[in-house]
UniProtKB/Swiss-Prot annotation:
It comes from Escherichia coli O6:K15:H31 (strain 536 / UPEC). Signal peptide: none annotated. The keyword Cell inner membrane applies. PANTHER family: CHLORAMPHENICOL EFFLUX PUMP RV0191, PURINE EFFLUX PUMP PBUE. Confers resistance to chloramphenicol. CDD domains: MFS_MdfA_MDR_like (cd17320). Residues 25-41, 90-92, 152-157, 223-244, 290-292, 352-355 are periplasmic. Keywords: Antibiotic resistance, Cell inner membrane, Cell membrane, Membrane, Transmembrane, Transmembrane helix, Transport. Residues 1-3, 63-68, 114-130, 179-202, 266-268, 314-330, 377-391 are cytoplasmic. Its main location: membrane. GO terms for cellular component: plasma membrane. GO terms for biological process: response to antibiotic. This is Multidrug resistance protein MdtL.
């Protein structure tokens, strides 16, 4: 079992590493490529576009051909794209490399969740996804620090060589450690069950909406945090870094505590707790009389996301024994596109950073609470929780 967990964790971590590792080198990259920092900030969106594009086909291929045939090319593409970015001499080539990086990371991301669905039952999967969420929270803190240390001695290209090295590690794990987990092709008698695993299932769609709104909350916070903390609240850059590190610490602590909470409380209870924390955060930020109270509201955001996201993802994947790859792709596409669409629309309409965050917090909590309370699984967990690998 440990081989599947290690490989899944490694496959997922390429995604946040590709986002956060290069940011510290952005000024030097812009200078060397004769581009403005504003022009290169689109590299974030290009990377996410690559991920979304990969998810359009990766899940279906993983269900038809296997998990390894998607993970291995995905890791290889991430390596090649990282090297391509390091050798880029124009901003256009650099952005093309970032898109290819996103394609590779997207393939690996989809496979990771499909593997966990193949190998873990609902309760264990919820615990593991909560742990994975905690580990993922470390990357936005450690990656810029590692990037800064690298750039003290080496040029910005070394950041992408570091990412390529990470990709090589994932490729080696996928080649030599990961075992295939895709369930055997269904017999004719199983075709009705395969056809019953519909993406239009009400319960699945409700969890798609809940996880997409939750990701929109956390990405809105990350995107607006410089404006909120430095421009509106007046913190210095060093203080901003400290606050973000502390919020990551809150996320990790709650994520690592959630598996223990699942041994005491029902998953539904934790999901309701998550949304109540979001609602409390939105109200706190809306009526906050001081910076201290606002910072408390921000910690509620991190705690709310960490306590409920892994549980919701686990529930979303639960009904899909034979189509876990497609389900994982659908979740990823919805989360990436939905959150990006909200942030873009809010900016176009002219909603300020503060109101943007408060709005998504309150909307997410109200909609999600209604879905949790009124959309129940269509059949008992035991009816669809088939695990294909136990060791």
């Amino acid at each position: 079992m440990s081989r599947f967990l290690i490989c899944s964790f490694a496959l997922v971590l390429l995604y946040p590493a590709g986002i956060d590792m290069y940011l510290v080198g952005l000024p030097r990259i812009a200078a060397d490529l004769n581009a403005s920092e504003a022009q290169l900030h689109i590299a974030f969106s290009v990377y996410l576009a690559g991920m979304a594009a990969a998810m359009l086909f990766a899940g279906k291929v993983a269900d038809r051909s296997g998990r390894k045939p998607v993970a291995i090319p995905g890791a290889a593409l991430f390596i090649i794209a990282s090297v391509f970015c390091s050798l880029a001499e124009t901003s256009a080539l650099f952005l093309a490399g970032r898109f290819l990086q996103g394609l590779g990371a997207g393939c690996c991301y989809v496979v990771a969740f499909a593997i966990l669905r193949d190998t873990l039952d609902d309760r264990r999967r919820a615990k593991v996804l909560s742990l994975l969420n905690g580990i993922t929270c470390i990357i936005p803190v450690l990656a810029p620090v590692l990037g800064h240390l690298i750039m003290l001695k080496f040029p910005w290209q070394s950041l992408f060589w570091t990412m390529a090295t990470m990709g090589i590690a994932v490729l080696m794990l996928s080649l030599f450690i990961l075992k295939e987990t895709r369930p055997a092709a269904p017999a004719a008698s199983d075709k009705p069950r395969e056809n019953s695993e519909s993406l239009l299932n009400r319960f699945f769609l409700s969890r798609v909406v809940i996880t997409t709104l939750s990701v929109s909350v956390i990405l809105t916070f990350v995107n607006t945090s410089p404006v909120l903390l430095m421009e509106i609240m007046g913190f210095e850059r060093g203080e901003y870094a400290t606050i973000m590190a502390l919020t990551a610490g809150v996320s990790m602590t709650v994520s690592f505590s959630t598996p223990f909470a699942l041994g005491i409380f029902k998953p539904r209870t934790l999901m309701i707790t998550s949304q109540v924390l979001f609602l409390a955060a939105g109200i706190t930020l809306a009526v906050s009389p001081s910076h201290a109270v606002s910072l408390f509201g921000i910690t509620l955001i991190c705690a709310g996301f960490s306590v409920g996201f892994g549980v919701a993802m686990s529930q979303a994947l639960g009904p899909f024994s034979l189509r876990a790859g497609v389900a994982s792709s659908t979740l990823g596409i919805a989360q990436v596109c939905g959150s990006s669409l909200w942030i873009w629309l809010a900016a176009v309409v002219g909603i300020g950073a503060w109101n943007m965050l408060i709005g998504i917090l309150i909307a997410c909590s109200i909609v999600s609470l209604l879905l949790i309370m009124f959309v129940a699984p269509g059949r008992p967990v035991a009816a669809h929780e088939e695990i294909h690998h136990h060791a």
